[in-house]
Amino acid sequence: MAGDPRGFAPLEPARHRVGERTELYDGTVTVDHWFTVPIDHALGLAEAEAQDAAGTGVGPHGRGTLTVFAREIRAKDDPGGERPWALYLQGGPGSAGPRPARLSGWLGALAESHRVLLLDQRGTGRSTPATVATLTAPGAFATDEAR
């Protein structure tokens, strides 16, 4: 959106990679997903990836992007993933999304009507880690005036 007062770049899709599909012992299907996104919301993905190539980003080793991991959970009666999405955000701070061995409890109940996406938020689980290098990189907390 042009003129966003927060300084965010126009919304564009993240780069998405679908990973391993696993069937758990109770028939539950899990699918791994990785999303590449800009570290700095003022940049579009192409600009952030150019920073990766040039080593000029605000992340560790000049990275301009980070990867966010999510695991999709499908009930055994929805192996093709036709149900609508429900996104689960783990409480924090610093915890990865749950890694169920079988469907039960709240997750089992939700999976009766939805595919559930268990997100490892930035810096947790299998997403790009938040480290001292990430948090102390030059420009990691740049103000809008400094851009």
Feature-to-residue mapping (PLM):
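Gly/Pro-rich cap/lid or specificity-loop segments adjacent to the active site
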Residues: 9-12, 20-147
